Regions:
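Non-catalytic terminal regions with compositionally biased, polar/charged low complexity
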Residues: 1-3, 10-147
């Protein structure tokens, strides 16, 4: 199987019911994108995740101001002072107020937790948050970004 796909798994019980409010699909904007899968997951706590899956990390998918050049990416909105952005085997992720760029395909997790930004990256990368540009080395542990 070499087509892009996205699956949503969420264990839940009667004591811990589902946190997902809705799941919808979206298509990348523009022409020329061969294989793409896009899912929008809305959670009951206000978090919204846009999940991008491409068959070719050299291609670029755009949707509502978001831009991804990767095999896989997750872009969340900001909710309760938190936000998650993940670039999977890619070189670029652009979202409102944030940009991640690498020279070579990498995995980058950029998280905002209680108002503070943290990063884990498999390769050196450049991150732009608002008007602040930060260069980050590869790290397997969370690094606090000084913003």
């Amino acid at each position: 199987w070499n087509r892009p796909f996205v699956s949503i798994y969420e264990p839940s019980t009667k004591k811990e019911p589902s946190a997902i409010q809705s799941v919808s699909y979206f298509d990348a904007e523009g022409a020329g994108l061969e294989d793409f899968a896009g899912i929008c997951v809305k959670s009951k706590n206000g978090r919204i995740d846009h999940i991008f899956s491409l068959s070719d990390a050299a291609q670029t998918a755009t949707y509502q101001g978001m831009k991804v050049k990767a095999d896989y990416a997750v872009i969340s909105n900001e909710y309760a002072g938190n936000r998650t952005l993940f670039l999977g085997n890619g070189t670029q992720l652009v979202a409102p107020g944030v940009m991640i760029q690498t020279d070579n395909a990498a995995n980058v997790l950029l998280e905002k937790k209680e108002g503070k930004w943290y990063i884990i990256s498999s390769a050196p990368c450049t991150v732009v948050i608002g008007d602040k540009k930060i260069k980050s080395d590869a790290s397997s542990e969370h690094i606090l970004l000084r913003i």
